[in-house]
Swiss-Prot record:
Record GO terms (molecular function): structural constituent of ribosome
Transmembrane spans: none
Any GO CC annotation of this UniProt entry: cytosolic large ribosomal subunit
Pfam families, alphabetized: Ribosomal_L35p
The keyword Coiled coil is assigned to this record: no
Keywords: Ribonucleoprotein, Ribosomal protein
Species for this entry: Borrelia hermsii (strain HS1 / DAH)
Official protein name in the record: Large ribosomal subunit protein bL35
Phylogenetic placement of the source organism: Bacteria, Pseudomonadati, Spirochaetota, Spirochaetia, Spirochaetales
Length: 65
């Protein structure tokens, strides 16, 4: 049987913590920032954690992570 392939787009977007949770960088912080409040920009700057149901799906996309 051939090796499982890593989904390259998922590899760029997600990272695993030491506890096995999946973290990601939030979107909407690249441009058109003037209309976004400073509170919103500050919250977007922090990384987010993926829910447990989505974590299972991401682990199938990243078999060797």
């Amino acid at each position: 049987m051939s090796k499982m392939k890593t989904c390259k787009s998922a590899r760029k977007r997600y990272a695993f913590t030491s506890k096995g949770k999946v973290k990601y960088k939030k979107q909407n912080l690249r441009h058109i920032l003037t209309k976004k409040s400073s509170k919103r920009r500050r919250k977007l700057g922090k990384s987010g954690l993926v829910s447990s149901s989505e974590t299972k799906r991401i682990k199938t996309l990243l078999p060797y992570a």
